[in-house]
């Protein structure tokens, strides 16, 4: 007979629920689970992922999050291989980076949504007004030369530079050479020069100027001496030499202008006279050829008005004045001189020799191939005595500081003693053409040293008083390498210009550097251009006009 068997009831008198675990459920793991969970799964591909970690813990399901039912492999098998899926602990920087990236994504999304909303609600009239405003803005920017850079700063438009001489309508262009083509020129078959004649006398350098620093600066004195800047055809020595030797004649300053022309920015001109089979390179009378430019190759060269203290011409006249005075002040004036065999050819009989600047002239000859016989008048500014008493010829030039706030300048009074390399690097950037010409002249003359003086204004707003802050000495060959001046390229440019001039007919020509382009042009000039007779006729006409007006 069937018998009812009463179940065992666990009575929990102190609480709710069973007081003991049945035997069949002992040691059984438990976790919240869902019927959709797979027991013993290797990887969880069903869980929902959130890109934004802020909402992960709030809205994600906790079912299947435990590891009680996960599969753990006890023994290694050859059929498959376990993969380490543990996550690397992120640094605080990585966590913050992800947080900022998510925030930026939300902002971009909100901005796009707002822009889309505005475009949807913008009426046609407002759209048309916005288009008109943008169109006018672009038009004004093109008209006034305003260009917005990435940092929203407008760069001032450079003024167009003036030509060194006005090109007339009856001048004909014979040749045009651009700088990129000239930079590729090379000529290496240059023989060593031979000295034809040496003239003049030079004074000895005062080594006390080598001890000048910014703490014991020395005032620059105004020295009244005569400087002769005679052009090629007016040189009596070159006229004498042209009868017997040479077919190309020039001065070192004119040749250096041509040989380093690819660094020039401002306009300059050289007169070429073809007489028979000979060529003479000249400079125009009363031109600015001998004025020293200031910050010519700077990114933002001086562009003040003509009457301003810092206008390009006033700065050039100031630099020339400083260079002349320093080149004489740093010598032992009135004392022993180093004299060449021949006297100075430019001193007149009624002029005191002590009133003439210390300059010696060396006439040298180069053979450029079989057909070019070059004769050049070179200059020395002084001499030095070495430790063993040997004599070294030097060229003395001056760098001047006018205002360190412009042209990315460096304050010389603070940096010249401690960071002289930074000063010369800045000057090389702002005056690359001038330094290259000086170096080329020193190499042509065969000077052993190039002396550079650093002269600054006593007051920034006063261009009449200056002080010497220091000096520096270079060997021309080493300095040419430092400033990346290739003499092979310089001789190549000169040979190219000479070959072109040799193909021209007899007459007068002009080599002109374009004021706003990297181009030099050769013009043929009518008879009488730049002659003294033409200037006298112009003066007579001016006098007649003044008499009629009076």
From Swiss-Prot:
Residues 288-302 are annotated as: RNA gate. It is found in: Cytoplasm. The keyword Cytoplasm applies. GO terms for cellular component: eukaryotic 43S preinitiation complex; eukaryotic 48S preinitiation complex; eukaryotic translation initiation factor 3 complex. The keyword Protease does not apply. Its main location: cytoplasm. Residues 526-550 are annotated as: Disordered. Keywords: Cytoplasm, Initiation factor, Protein biosynthesis, RNA-binding. GO terms for molecular function: mRNA cap binding; RNA binding; translation initiation factor activity. Residues 532-550 have a biased composition (Acidic residues). It holds the Pfam family eIF-3_zeta. InterPro entries: eIF3d. GO terms for biological process: cap-dependent translational initiation; formation of cytoplasmic translation initiation complex; translational initiation. It comes from the Eukaryota. Transmembrane segments: none annotated. The RNA gate region regulates mRNA cap recognition to prevent promiscuous mRNA-binding before assembly of eif3d into the full eukaryotic translation initiation factor 3 (eIF-3) complex. Belongs to the eIF-3 subunit D family. Component of the eukaryotic translation initiation factor 3 (eIF-3) complex, which is composed of 13 subunits: eif3a, eif3b, eif3c, eif3d, eif3e, eif3f, eif3g, eif3h, eif3i, eif3j, eif3k, eif3l and eif3m. mRNA cap-binding component of the eukaryotic translation initiation factor 3 (eIF-3) complex, which is involved in protein synthesis of a specialized repertoire of mRNAs and, together with other initiation factors, stimulates binding of mRNA and methionyl-tRNAi to the 40S ribosome. The eIF-3 complex specifically targets and initiates translation of a subset of mRNAs involved in cell proliferation. In the eIF-3 complex, eif3d specifically recognizes and binds the 7-methylguanosine cap of a subset of mRNAs. This is Eukaryotic translation initiation factor 3 subunit D. It comes from Xenopus laevis. The gene is eif3d.
């Amino acid at each position: 007979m069937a018998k009812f068997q009463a179940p065992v009831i666990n009575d929990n008198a102190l609480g709710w629920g069973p007081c003991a675990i049945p035997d069949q459920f002992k040691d059984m793991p438990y976790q919240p689970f869902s019927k959709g969970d797979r027991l013993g799964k290797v990887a969880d591909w069903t869980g929902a992922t959130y890109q934004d970690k802020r909402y992960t813990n709030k809205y994600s399901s906790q079912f299947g999050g435990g590891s009680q039912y996960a599969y753990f492999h006890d023994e290694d098998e050859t059929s498959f291989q376990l993969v380490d899926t543990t996550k690397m602990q992120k640094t605080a920087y990585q966590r913050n980076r992800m947080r900022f990236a998510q925030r930026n994504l939300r902002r971009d999304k909100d901005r796009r949504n707002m822009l889309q909303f505005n475009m949807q609600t913008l009426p046609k009239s407002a759209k048309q007004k916005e288009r008109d405003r943008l169109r006018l803005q672009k038009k004004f920017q093109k008209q006034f030369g305003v260009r917005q850079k990435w940092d929203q700063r407008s760069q001032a438009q450079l003024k167009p530079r003036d030509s060194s001489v006005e090109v007339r309508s009856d001048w004909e262009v014979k040749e045009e050479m651009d700088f990129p083509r000239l930079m590729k020129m090379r000529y290496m078959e240059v023989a060593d020069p031979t000295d034809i004649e040496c003239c003049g006398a030079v004074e000895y350098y005062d080594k006390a100027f080598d001890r000048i620093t910014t703490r014991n600066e020395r005032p620059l004195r105004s020295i009244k001496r005569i400087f002769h800047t005679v052009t090629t055809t007016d040189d009596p020595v070159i006229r004498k030499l042209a009868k017997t030797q040479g077919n190309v004649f020039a001065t070192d300053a004119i040749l250096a202008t041509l040989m380093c022309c690819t660094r020039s920015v401002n306009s300059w001109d050289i007169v070429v006279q073809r007489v028979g089979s000979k060529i003479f390179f000249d400079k125009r009378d009363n031109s600015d050829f001998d004025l020293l430019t200031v910050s010519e190759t700077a990114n933002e060269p001086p562009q003040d008005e003509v009457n301003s203290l810092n206008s390009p011409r006033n700065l050039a006249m100031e630099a020339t004045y400083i260079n002349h005075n320093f080149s004489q002040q740093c010598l032992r004036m009135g004392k022993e001189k180093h004299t060449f065999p021949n006297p100075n050819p430019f001193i007149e009989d009624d002029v005191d020799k002590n009133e003439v600047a210390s300059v010696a002239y060396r006439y040298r000859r180069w053979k450029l191939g079989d057909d070019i016989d070059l004769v050049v008048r070179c200059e020395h500014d002084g001499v030095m005595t070495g430790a063993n008493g040997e004599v070294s010829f030097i060229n003395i030039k001056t760098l001047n500081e006018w205002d360190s706030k412009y042209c990315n300048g460096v304050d010389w009074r603070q940096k010249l003693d401690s960071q002289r390399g930074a000063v010369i690097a800045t000057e090389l950037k702002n005056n690359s053409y001038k330094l290259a010409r000086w170096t080329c002249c020193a190499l042509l003359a065969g000077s052993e040293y190039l002396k550079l003086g650093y002269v600054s204004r006593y007051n920034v707003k006063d261009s009449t008083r200056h002080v010497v802050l220091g000096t520096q000495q270079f060997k021309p060959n080493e300095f040419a390498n430092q400033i990346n001046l290739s003499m092979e390229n310089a001789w190549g440019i000169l040979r190219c210009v000479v070959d072109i001039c040799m193909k021209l007919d007899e007459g007068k020509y002009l080599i002109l550097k374009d004021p706003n382009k990297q181009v030099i042009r050769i013009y043929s000039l009518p008879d009488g251009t730049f002659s003294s007779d033409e200037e006298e006729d112009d003066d007579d006409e001016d006098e007649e006009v003044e008499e009629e007006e009076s």
